[in-house]
């Protein structure tokens, strides 16, 4: 560890984080910098991320807000971080995910490595041969209404790295930059589109339910013995 730095963050992890972001592709954020442009000065850009994150001086820029249509009607806001910020988020994800992943319910499929919506569908189809009813529900505005304080409290239970908590707080508070250029502060919720979205939105407690105030839904999601299948906001309980 560099003795002049406050936090121990590996430069190798920062480089790996960029490779993950590059593989995922994605659009430019508020600075209009593409992955190709970022990569053209890769050494300096990765050093900048490492230097700021390891010294506690990294502050995320505004998140580019894009409205996308919902299947049920209306729109939802997709948050597009800058490439640099996506790399910083991926650094945090690479440190945090190994600690959280073993604690997740085996029937939780949303945003987990090696699992997909297709896997959730396969589990549901298999159980249709054993159970004669299915309850499907959608948690309305799940990501838009997550309580920041409760979320940070829950994440703090699963890591002893203070820099992870520090930066998650800053990401939660990063404002939206709307299409017309105006900046909108956020006091709750977490943008859909960020790299650490799943780690910020789900905890291993209570069947990985997001920090919900609706206790009956939390209870329903904990009925793992009756064939619970979770995929993002959309969930199914079979019996």
Predicted regions and their residues:
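Intein modules and their embedded homing endonuclease domains
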Residues: 40-41, 48-51
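Conserved polymerase palm-domain catalytic core
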Residues: 52-67, 71, 103-107, 111-239
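Conserved phosphate-binding loops in nucleotide/dinucleotide-binding enzymes
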Residues: 77-78, 82
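Duplex nucleic acid-engaging cores and interfaces of nucleic-acid transaction enzymes
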Residues: 84, 88
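Short helix-capping/linker segments at secondary-structure and domain boundaries
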Residues: 96-103
């Amino acid at each position: 560890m560099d003795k002049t730095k406050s936090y121990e963050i590996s430069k190798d992890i920062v480089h790996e984080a960029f490779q993950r972001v590059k593989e995922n592709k994605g659009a430019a954020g508020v600075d209009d910098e593409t992955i190709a442009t970022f990569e053209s000065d890769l050494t300096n850009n990765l050093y900048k991320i490492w230097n700021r994150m390891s010294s506690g001086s990294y502050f995320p820029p505004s998140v580019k807000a894009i409205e996308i249509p919902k299947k049920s009607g209306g729109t939802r806001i997709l948050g597009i971080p800058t490439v640099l910020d996506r790399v910083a988020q991926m650094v945090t994800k690479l440190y945090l995910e190994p600690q959280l992943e073993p604690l997740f319910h085996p029937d939780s499929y949303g945003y987990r490595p090696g699992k997909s919506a297709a896997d959730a569908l396969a589990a549901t189809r298999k159980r249709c041969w054993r159970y004669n009813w299915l309850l499907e529900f959608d948690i309305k505005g799940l990501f838009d209404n997550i309580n920041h304080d409760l979320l940070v409290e829950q994440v703090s239970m699963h890591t002893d790295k203070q820099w992870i908590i520090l930066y998650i707080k800053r990401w939660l508070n990063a404002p939206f930059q709307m299409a017309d250029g105006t900046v909108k502060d956020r006091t709750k919720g977490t943008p859909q589109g960020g790299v650490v979205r799943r780690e910020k939105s789900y905890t291993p407690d209570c069947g990985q339910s997001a920090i919900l105030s609706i206790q009956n839904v939390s209870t329903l999601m904990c009925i793992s013995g009756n064939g619970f299948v979770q995929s993002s906001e959309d969930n199914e309980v079979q019996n």
